[in-house]
Curated annotation (Swiss-Prot):
Species annotation: Bacillus licheniformis (strain ATCC 14580 / DSM 13 / JCM 2505 / CCUG 7422 / NBRC 12200 / NCIMB 9375 / NCTC 10341 / NRRL NRS-1264 / Gibson 46)
Pfam families: CCG
Domain of life: Bacteria
Family to which the UniProt record says this protein belongs: Belongs to the LutA/YkgE family.
A GO BP entry: lactate metabolic process
GO cellular component, one term: cytosol
Record GO terms (molecular function): oxidoreductase activity
Protein name: Lactate utilization protein A
Function: Is involved in L-lactate degradation and allows cells to grow with lactate as the sole carbon source.
Length: 238
């Protein structure tokens, strides 16, 4: 099975280890992974900031870049959801809307792809840690991926799991929200960190790098001994 990796800006610029873990994991599960070099930002930050015309330039580039892909997989629910939004955003441009729909139909968030396309729940991972899991807003509320991450984490050998209190509360990142509404964002992430501390977990796991950077940054500034890991890194652990 051929998979084209949609790496996302945050992984590309700040968390290349997540990209590496994603590729290694998919290859170990029998996928042939390629990285289309024409990919850029999906356009979400620009679109959410009101720069619709500029964001559509990026969207068209991404549609063309992944046009020949069999499957498109991303280690980010937020960015994968943006691809799913393309058909709606191009609804007044029929030719582009058709191309956008084809892209949307073959795009998956990583855990969703593993569980619902590859039909695998036990990837053979081992991690001797006490962990809790942060549920990201875009991945669950918009993309609709709710069960796949936990189905995979339940099979990680040695992982002691503790539910996160108020797990559906936003961490305060929200892309440009954390910049535009910084004081509110800071309060929200403080509350999220307090919930993480309440679990007494060694590691916080999540599936969106934006959330993990936001929460992890706050954990670091508070000098808390809590490790932050993307779910791709956990599933690739041996």
């Amino acid at each position: 099975m051929k998979v084209s990796l949609f790496i996302t800006c945050l992984v590309d610029m700040f968390q290349s280890n997540v990209g590496k873990a994603t590729v290694e994991l998919l290859e170990r599960l029998g996928c042939e992974v390629d990285f289309p070099e024409g990919q850029i930002c999906c356009g979400q930050p620009a679109y959410n900031s009101g720069y619709v015309k500029d964001s559509k330039k990026a969207m068209r580039r991404m549609i063309e870049t992944f046009e020949s892909a069999e499957y498109v997989v991303s280690p980010s629910g937020s960015c994968a959801f943006m691809f799913k939004e393309y058909p709606h955003l191009f609804r007044d441009e029929p030719a582009w809307a058709e191309k956008a729909q084809r892209l949307a139909d073959k795009t998956y968030e990583l855990t969703d792809f593993i569980v619902n396309v590859l039909k695998i729940e036990d990837v053979g991972a081992t991690l001797e840690k006490k962990a809790t899991y942060h549920t990201s807003c875009h991945m669950t509320r918009l993309l609709g991926v709710t069960d796949a991450p936990m189905k995979l984490l339940r099979h990680v050998k040695g992982l002691e799991f503790t539910p996160l209190p108020r797990k559906h509360d936003c961490c305060g990142f929200g892309g440009t929200f954390s910049v535009k509404m910084s004081q509110i964002s800071e309060q929200m992430v403080d509350e999220k960190v307090a919930c993480v501390e309440e679990t007494a977990a060694d590691v916080l796991i999540g599936a969106d790098c934006g959330c993990l950077m936001n929460i992890g940054g706050r954990i670091g500034r508070k000098n808390k001994p809590i490790e932050v890991m993307h779910i791709a890194e956990v599933l690739n652990s041996r």
